[in-house]
Structure formats: structure tokens, C-alpha cells
Amino acid sequence: GGAPVLIPVITDLKALTVLVSELDGLVMSGGGDINPLYLHEEPIPQLQDVDTLRDEYDLILLRLAANRQIPIMGICRGHQIMNVAFEGSVYQDIHSQANHALLKHSQTLAREYPSHTVTLEPGMNRLRTIFNGEEQILVNSFHHQAVKEVAPGFRATATAPDGINEAMEHTEKTIFGVQWHPEAMAPQGDEAMKALFAYHIENARRFAKAKAIHQRIVTIDSHTDTPMIFPGEFNIGEKEGGKVNLPFMEEGRIDATFMVAYIPQGKRDEASLQAATAYAIERLNQVKRQQTLHPDRMVIATTPQEIRTIKAQGKKAICLGIENGYALGKLVENL
């Protein structure tokens, strides 16, 4: 089995980043209603107790874990908040908003007993695999909110007889959620619910093996034109899509990258060559400047051993380079 780690309900990004980086898997548990402001909606009268601190905490955890490819399992509210995090929608109250007849989704039976069926979607999906190809299973039910429109990148994998979503999975990442509470049924010997947790734990075990490989080897991005993409002064400590930077390297466990000055071939007259050399030097100096901005996160490396030493220090190694020899001009000494 897996060893549970309780994460305190805090919203300090640095603290949660450190905690999540040590995890092999994440379970998003049940709880109260989700604040509709996160859905860009006003609260309806049927909305029950919300905890905005918990919402913010859950959303941060989900983003941190998903960006690091950590396997995630959502349960009930965890299933719903996962959908919110990835820009799906949620019913504030299914009974007043679904606009059709519904089952009883808040059972009065004891939690370990199932109260209705769910139908698993046909085709290849994780739930069908976990439940050995079964088309229908029995689940318990304790909710009045539910996934409405499944988030982009996800697909629905189970539905209640009244059409309410009961499960979904990401089409690429190892992320899935269920609306019911398998943690209440598994201890009573329900083999199907045990299989859900076994599946998640196996995913976490594989992720732990992948992390161990990254700890043992040096992972290098051998070429990036980042210095040429950023105009003027830039800051690789800030996360910006489409550009290699420290946050992306940390999330992806990249130990080192070569940041190069790429100068396209131009005229060979003295003035043009000097301009190319000067521009390459300016770009590489901007890379060197990053070390003064982020001395606790990166170091400029010039040898393989320096890369290994920097990795052992928990920092990222940045190597300098040029692409195309135009910046050298006619002087090999410019190397």
C-alpha cells in the first residue's frame, strides 16, 4: 500500500511547493461546497457551507501536482474541484439546476453501503480497466454539487442513471476523479473500491521510480534559444509559457540547459561582424545576470563536473553557448 502524508491546509505557495515536490501521488478528498466565485457565478440560495481557504488550498495543490506530472485521484468534492481547476464547470446544486428528474444523491444509508448504480463509458478508459471491463457498478452517494461540463483535456468515464457525471479522467496525465466515496466502501471488503486505490498507488509507485531515475542521472536540455526570445533584460526565474525558465526546469526535473545566442548569418564586412559579436556577448551577459538574480536556484556551469556539483546542491545548471559561427567573426579567439 501507500503511506499517507497529511498536508496542512495552508496557502503559502513556497511551503506547498516543497511539500508537493516530495509526494509520489495526491488524493483530493471530500468536503464542503465550492465557492461559486471560482466559477465566475453568483451564489444561489441552495448553496451550502463553503470554505474559501480550502478552495484556494485545493486549487494550488492541483496545479502544483499536475505541473509535476504527479498522479492525482479526486474523491467527491476532490473530483469537482479538479474539474474547476482545469476550467470545467460544476452545478452549485443539482436539484435546482439540472432541470430534469434526479436520483437521491444524498443517501441516508450508512456510508459503506451503495445506494445507486453508475454506468461506465464504453471503450478504453481507466475505470473499465480497473473494474475488469464491467459495464455497471454500485456506488454510495453523498453530494448535492456535481461536475456539469467536463474540463478540456478530460473525458467522462461514468454516469449515474439520471445523467449526473460520476467519474472522469485526463486523456494524457495520470489524473482521475470519482463522485462517490470509495474510502467508505473499501474497508468493508468491497473489492472494486479497493482496486481504485490499488490503481492509484501503483501509479504513485511508478512515479516514485521515475523520480529515482532523475535523482540518479543528469537530465540536460541541450539547446534553447531563450536568450534570443526574451527582449532586452529578462528574468528566467519567472514562469512564462513557451520559454525555458527555472520554474519549468524545476517542475520537469531538468538539471541543466544550454542557453545559446543564435546569430543568423549576415554580411562579412568588419562592422557587421563586430555587431554580431557584440550582440552575442550582450545576450550571454544577460544569461550570466540571471545568476545574480537567482543565486539560490541556478549557477553558470562550464564543465560536466560543475553540472553534477550544482545538481547535488539542489540548483539548476545553466551552460552558455552560441549557435552558428557568425558571432565569432574572423577571430577564433572569440571562443
Regions found by a protein language model. Name each.
Residues 68-70, 316:
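A short helix->loop->beta-strand "cap" motif at the edges of active sites that frequently abuts
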Residues 2-24, 28, 51-68, 95-211:
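Amide-donor transfer/coupling interface in amidating biosynthetic enzymes
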Residues 76, 143, 181, 223-225:
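Histidine-centered divalent metal-coordination motifs
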Residues 31-34:
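Short glycine-rich anion-binding loops that position phosphate/pyrophosphate groups of nucleotides
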Residues 209-335:
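N-terminal hydrophobic targeting/anchoring segments and the immediately downstream early-domain regions
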Residues 39-56:
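A short, gly/pro- and small-residue-rich
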Residues 74, 78, 83, 87:
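Gly/Ala-rich beta-loop-alpha elbow adjacent to hydrolase catalytic centers
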